[in-house]
């Protein structure tokens, strides 16, 4: 479960980075 949660968290962070990049652009 911990590993799965970590993977989901990593994906969420990546999505946030993409959203920030779109806002900056």
Curated annotation (Swiss-Prot):
Ranges of compositional bias, category Polar residues: 16-25
Top-level lineage group: Eukaryota
Residue segments, region Disordered: 1-25
Bridged cysteine pairs (disulfide): none
Comp. bias (Basic and acidic residues): 1-10
Protein name: Unknown protein 4
Organism: Lonomia obliqua (Moth)
Lineage, top ranks: Eukaryota, Metazoa, Ecdysozoa, Arthropoda, Hexapoda
């Amino acid at each position: 479960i911990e590993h799965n949660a970590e993977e989901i968290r990593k994906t969420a962070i990546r999505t946030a980075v993409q959203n920030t990049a779109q806002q900056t652009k």
